[in-house]
């Protein structure tokens, strides 16, 4: 491509300050440095994590190019990059896999030591590894976000945060594999390890929660109870495999008590994809005594209280990061599984808009009217 080695001027949505609409601006994207790849973003989505970062309580750095769920095409590569070439279809992600560190070499985790280069692994990654940015606008340096920054027509990522995928992949669907689908689906398959014939409860029916429902279904769960305070999400949950749907606001007793009654003692597996203090407690309480397992997928609170009695009686709580998948190795396989119709991503996509309408996509999400909105340039 004629742009290799040159600064690219393109369109981006920049967050200049907290709690404000994103601004469509021209941005300059520098060429990739060593072990970096510059990507032309084809499709991206808005995830709640992107918008939560603009909350003043998060103390994010501004201005910043948000976005971390996308798919695109390699425009150019930096020195030392051997696994990618211009024209490759790729999916970037916030969970790196360097394949060299102690964590990457262990089969016990999907974390990577590269996360230690950043203040907080799933939120910041606000600069490249040399502690500089590849973005400028209006003569100001612009921060990166979660190692991806997909709200720009071109972005630069580390090769450890990138996977090459099938040349025939539909980028307007497999972009969901960059975060939301993979996190929820893997939470059920890899972390909870849902078993055939088991009973499951999934709290929160956004993209991650609905993907967890898909995972429970594929794992062979015989009962999948989906919980959300927005009943409009229930038809989609049932279409994806939920057997029961509960809205806590419609019940005359705590939802965990209702689940315990429905299942004759509690579910084998619960997955909290909402992450509030209330859902965390309910997700633990609704599991069966003796072996009940609660997997924490989303977390909007920094701390949770767990009864030691619950632990003594056999209940367990575990967390999951990127669905337990080793990212570089697993993302291409997930794309192949989608191509082979092992699961359907179409039901997770509720809207499609041009990138210029990104603030409309955010409004749809905040109003609970969308699961995922695909944005294209």
Swiss-Prot record:
CDD domains named in the record: alcohol_DH_class_I_II_IV
Cofactors (names): Zn(2+)
Cofactor: how and how many bound: Binds 2 Zn(2+) ions per subunit.
Catalyzed reactions: all-trans-retinol + NAD(+) = all-trans-retinal + NADH + H(+); 9-cis-retinol + NAD(+) = 9-cis-retinal + NADH + H(+); 20-oxo-(5Z,8Z,11Z,14Z)-eicosatetraenoate + NAD(+) + H2O = (5Z,8Z,11Z,14Z)-eicosatetraenedioate + NADH + 2 H(+); 20-hydroxy-(5Z,8Z,11Z,14Z)-eicosatetraenoate + NAD(+) = 20-oxo-(5Z,8Z,11Z,14Z)-eicosatetraenoate + NADH + H(+)
Binding locations of Zn(2+) 2: 98, 101, 104, 112
GO cellular component: cytosol
Gene3D superfamilies linked to this entry: Medium-chain alcohol dehydrogenases, catalytic domain, NAD(P)-binding Rossmann-like Domain
PROSITE patterns named in the record: ADH_ZINC
InterPro entries: ADH-like_C, ADH-like_N, ADH_Zn_CS, GroES-like_sf, NAD(P)-bd_dom_sf, PKS_ER
Summary of the tissues where the protein is detected: Liver specific.
Record localization: Cytoplasm
GO molecular function: alcohol dehydrogenase (NAD+) activity; aldose reductase (NADPH) activity; all-trans retinal binding; all-trans-retinol dehydrogenase (NAD+) activity; benzaldehyde dehydrogenase (NAD+) activity; NAD binding; NADPH:quinone reductase activity; retinol binding
Superkingdom: Eukaryota
Binding residue positions for Zn(2+) 1: 47, 68, 179
Notes on how activity is controlled: Oxidation of 20-HETE is inhibited by low concentrations of N-heptylformamide. Oxidation of 20-HETE is a decreased by 55-65% by either all-trans-retinol or all-trans-retinoic acid. Strongly inhibited by omega-hydroxy fatty acids.
Keyword set, alphabetical order: Cytoplasm, Lipid metabolism, Metal-binding, NAD, Oxidoreductase, Zinc
Family, similarity comment: Belongs to the zinc-containing alcohol dehydrogenase family. Class-II subfamily.
Protein name: All-trans-retinol dehydrogenase [NAD(+)] ADH4
Naturally occurring in which organism (per UniProt): Rattus norvegicus
């Amino acid at each position: 491509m004629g742009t290799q080695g040159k600064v690219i001027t393109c369109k981006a949505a920049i967050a200049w300050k907290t709690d404000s609409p994103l601004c469509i601006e021209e941005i300059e994207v520098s060429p990739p440095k060593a072990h970096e790849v510059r990507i032309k973003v084809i499709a991206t989505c808005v995830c709640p994590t992107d918008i939560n970062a603009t909350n003043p309580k998060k103390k994010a750095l501004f201005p910043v190019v948000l976005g971390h769920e996308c798919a695109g095409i390699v425009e150019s590569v930096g020195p030392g990059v051997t696994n990618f070439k211009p024209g490759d279809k790729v999916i970037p992600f916030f969970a790196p896999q360097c394949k060299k560190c102690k964590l990457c070499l262990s089969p016990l985790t999907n974390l990577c030591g590269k996360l230690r280069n950043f203040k907080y692994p799933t939120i910041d990654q606000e600069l490249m590894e040399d502690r500089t940015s590849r973005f400028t606008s209006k003569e100001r340096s612009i921060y990166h976000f979660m190692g991806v920054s997909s709200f720009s027509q071109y972005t630069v990522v580390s090769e450890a945060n990138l996977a090459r995928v099938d040349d025939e992949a539909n980028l307007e669907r497999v972009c969901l594999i960059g975060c939301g689908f993979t996190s929820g689906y893997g939470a059920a398959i890899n972390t909870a390890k849902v078993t055939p014939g088991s009973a499951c409860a999934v709290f929160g029916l956004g993209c991650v929660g609905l993907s967890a429902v898909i995972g429970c279904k594929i794992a062979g769960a015989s009962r999948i109870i989906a919980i959300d305070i927005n009943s409009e999400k229930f038809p989609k949950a049932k279409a994806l495999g939920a057997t029961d749907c509960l809205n806590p606001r419609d019940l005359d007793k705590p939802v965990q008590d209702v689940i315990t009654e429905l299942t004759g003692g509690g579910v084998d597996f619960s997955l909290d994809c909402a992450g509030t203090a209330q859902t965390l407690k309910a997700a633990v309480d609704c599991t069966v005594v003796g072996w009940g397992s609660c997997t924490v997928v989303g977390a909007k609170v920094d701390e949770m209280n767990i009864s030691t009695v619950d632990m003594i009686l056999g209940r367990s709580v575990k967390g999951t990061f990127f669905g337990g998948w080793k990212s570089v190795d697993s993302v291409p396989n997930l794309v192949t599984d989608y191509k082979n119709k092992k699961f359907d991503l179409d039901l997770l996509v509720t809207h499609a808009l041009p990138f210029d309408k990104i603030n409309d996509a955010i409004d749809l999400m905040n109003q609970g009217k969308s699961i995922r909105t695909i944005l294209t340039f």
